[in-house]
């Protein structure tokens, strides 16, 4: 038991290495830019991007991943019955009985209720178990080693802003240092130890800029589609089958799902995402017969989008029958 505990502690310690590396690079970039270059015109923009970058990075790292609430845990009697039962079919019947009162619309690939034996909870839609954090995370996107944290419902907006401001930070440094970088190679830069900071500052900023740009673009595309990284690779399965666009509500509504309704808060690393992370509006055209209609929309109201599409589909079928 003791060696396992020591190993686990070592793994947790090593997991902070990428975060410490980024922190050291940022601290050095601050010294190289502010102390060695120290141009007043640049410092205002630099500090603005620096503060927003550090703020969003901090929020991404230290915002605790959201977990399923107690209502998704099996009641004591059903839990005992589930653990005693050996047959998967009977276990599924127990889960289905409990799930009827929950806002669940996604299933496993085999059409079963998604249950985490590790956390002993019925998984809400878009929830997945993270082996690194050893917990189920609401609307899990991925586990990021660069923040040593799971990126999910509670901090996905912060992660997007972290990518945004880190890209702005690197672009600004690379652009403003470029002239000194050129002077370095043309031997026009005065001889001092600062010239080496200029050289490496440009290389590091350009390198991070290129790597962040692709990740930033990809996650903007995911936000526009209202998908997580996991859902992009494996489409969520509904009762009618897999649907990669199952949670897509249209571009503007998809953006609001992550950033909220009030645009004045979009660029600030404060939580404004819609919903509670336990249930999500969908673009389903048919209502799940096994779920109560009041669960279709977080807050107890049926999604207007679902009603319109459902009624339209019903009227179209009736018209076709009359003809």
Curated annotation (Swiss-Prot):
Q: What domain comment accompanies this record?
A: The DHHC domain is required for palmitoyltransferase activity.
Q: What does this protein do?
A: Palmitoyltransferase that could catalyze the addition of palmitate onto various protein substrates. Catalyzes palmitoylation of Cys residues on protein substrates and has a preference for acyl-CoA with C16 fatty acid chains but may also utilize acyl-CoA with C14 and C18 fatty acid chains.
Name of the featured protein? Palmitoyltransferase ZDHHC20-B
Please name the InterPro entries in this protein's record: Palmitoyltrfase_DHHC, PFA4/ZDH16/20/ERF2-like
What enzyme category does the UniProt record give?
transferase
Q: Which reaction does it catalyse?
A: L-cysteinyl-[protein] + hexadecanoyl-CoA = S-hexadecanoyl-L-cysteinyl-[protein] + CoA; L-cysteinyl-[protein] + tetradecanoyl-CoA = S-tetradecanoyl-L-cysteinyl-[protein] + CoA; L-cysteinyl-[protein] + octadecanoyl-CoA = S-octadecanoyl-L-cysteinyl-[protein] + CoA
**Membrane spanning segments where?**
15-35, 42-62, 158-178, 196-219
GO CC, sorted alphabetically, is:
endoplasmic reticulum membrane; endoplasmic reticulum-Golgi intermediate compartment membrane; Golgi membrane; perinuclear region of cytoplasm; plasma membrane
UniProt topological domain (Cytoplasmic) ranges: 1-14, 63-157, 220-323
Keywords from the named record: Acyltransferase, Cell membrane, Cytoplasm, Endoplasmic reticulum, Golgi apparatus, Lipoprotein, Membrane, Metal-binding, Palmitate, Phosphoprotein, Transferase, Transmembrane, Transmembrane helix, Zinc
E.C. no: 2.3.1.225, 2.3.1.-
GN (gene name): zdhhc20b
- The DHHC domain extends over 114-164
């Amino acid at each position: 038991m003791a060696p396992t505990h020591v190993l686990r502690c070592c793994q947790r310690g090593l997991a902070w290495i990428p975060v410490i590396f980024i922190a050291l690079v940022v601290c050095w970039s601050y010294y190289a830019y502010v102390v060695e270059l120290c141009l007043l015109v640049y410092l205002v923009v630099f500090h603005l991007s620096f503060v927003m970058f550090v703020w969003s990075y901090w929020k991404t790292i230290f915002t605790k991943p959201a977990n399923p609430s107690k209502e998704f845990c099996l009641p004591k009697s059903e839990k005992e019955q589930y653990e005693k039962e050996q047959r998967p079919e009977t276990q599924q019947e127990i889960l289905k009985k409990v799930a009827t009162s929950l806002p669940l619309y996604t299933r496993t690939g085999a059409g079963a209720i998604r249950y985490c034996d590790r956390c002993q909870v019925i998984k809400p839609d878009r929830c997945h178990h993270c082996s690194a954090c050893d917990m189920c995370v609401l609307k899990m996107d991925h586990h990021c080693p660069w923040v040593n944290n799971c990126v999910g419902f509670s901090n996905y907006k912060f992660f997007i802003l972290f990518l945004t401001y880190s890209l702005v930070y690197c672009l600004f440094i690379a652009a403003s240092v470029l002239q000194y970088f050129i002077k370095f190679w043309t031997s026009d830069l005065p001889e001092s130890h600062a010239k080496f900071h200029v050289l490496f500052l440009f290389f590091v900023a350009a390198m991070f800029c290129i790597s962040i740009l692709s990740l930033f673009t990809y996650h903007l595309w995911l936000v526009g589609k209202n998908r997580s990284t996991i859902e992009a690779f494996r489409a969520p399965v509904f009762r009618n089958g897999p649907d990669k666009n199952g949670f897509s509500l249209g571009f503007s509504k998809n953006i609001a799902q992550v950033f909220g309704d009030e645009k004045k808060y979009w660029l600030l690393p404060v939580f404004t995402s819609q919903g509670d992370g336990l249930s999500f509006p969908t673009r389903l055209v048919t209502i799940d017969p096994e779920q109560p209609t009041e669960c279709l929309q977080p807050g107890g109201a049926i999604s207007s989008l679902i009603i319109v599409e459902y009624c339209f589909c019903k009227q179209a079928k009736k018209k076709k029958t009359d003809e």
